[in-house]
Swiss-Prot record:
It is found in: Nucleus. GO terms for cellular component: nucleus. InterPro entries: HMG_box_dom, HMG_box_dom_sf, SRY-related_HMG-box_TF-like. PROSITE patterns: HMG_BOX_2 (PS50118). This is SRY-related protein CH1.
């Protein structure tokens, strides 16, 4: 989306992508959710003492 609309602000891109995400079925979302879980587990294994500190 950003490549197709190089002058579009990031906030607008985020809004549009969020709207698209809400339109997806659970089955369409599943691969992304599973991949996020896999990355989370990998990160926890590699950095067991990591604590998010903004």
């Amino acid at each position: 989306m950003a490549l197709e609309n190089p002058k579009m602000h990031n906030s607008e891109i985020s809004k549009r992508l969020g709207a698209e995400w809400k339109q997806l079925s659970e089955a369409e979302k599943r691969p992304f959710i599973d991949e996020a879980k896999r990355h989370r587990a990998m990160h926890m294994k590699e950095y067991p003492d990591y604590k998010y500190r903004p």
